[in-house]
Amino acid sequence: ADLHRELESALARFLGMDDAILFAACFDANGGLFEPLLGPDDAIISDALNHASIIDGIRLCKAKRYRYATSDMEDLETQLKAAKSDGARHIMIATDGVFSMDGTLAKLPEIKALADQYGALTMVDDCHATGFMGPKGQGTPAHFNTSVDILTGTLGKALGGALGGYIAGPQPVIDLLRQRARPYLFSNALPPMITAAGIAALKLVEEGDILRARLFENAAHWRKGLTDQGFTLLDGEHPIIPVMLGEAQLAQDMAR
């Protein structure tokens, strides 16, 4: 338990949040987030390309559900207006920080501005950014120099590569989740060796400016090499580099 609290406190400090709560995986974190916080009188507005764990977590809660076309701020505002018109008590906007299939970044500054305008909360799954995006690897909000209300993330990628997930946010939210998030209450805690590895990985991340620079140099080199060979890529700088093949059978053949 001491190791777990040490890692939770370290994650909260690293991410600039009040506190954090650990889960066995980020799938569990996203699955346990929405139901304790949002009821039938509330609304959740989700990006159309959000990760499956966010989609499943939203399905488990009783809030009214709205969806906006991915990164379409005009459509997001339309859904915010609809939620307001439908009498939503509380509204939460949920998005990936980086979309896992194409490496594009959510428009967090614009999302935050709309959230402030309509009195909505913001939730960001930053699994594909924490550890290497933004100053000191603090993720997509830090990359954009903005803030969000709730962050979820994983220990299974840049923060160690084994397993584990977390939710970081305001103290009242984390306190409530400790009492009501079912994947936290009714599942196993992280093994102590994984927790200790997460603490060590976080220290490496905080001191990893040289490694982060090398990662983006490698990604740029790989993008150039693929482009020079005639492959079609989506624009971007993120280490997720989608190759657009345009045909299902060709994609299966390439995967082999």
Model regions and ranges:
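A glycine-/small-polar-enriched, mobile loop at the entrance of the PLP active site in fold-type I
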Residues: 1-5, 182-187
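Conserved PLP-binding catalytic core of the aspartate aminotransferase-like
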Residues: 213-222, 228-256
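Amphipathic alpha-helix from the class-I
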Residues: 193-213, 224-229
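Short loop-beta-helix segment that forms the pyridoxal 5′-phosphate
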Residues: 8-32
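Conserved PLP-anchoring active-site segment centered on the Schiff-base-forming lysine
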Residues: 33-52
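Active-site PLP attachment segment
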Residues: 136, 142-176
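Active-site phosphate-binding strand-loop segment of PLP-dependent enzymes
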Residues: 66, 70-124
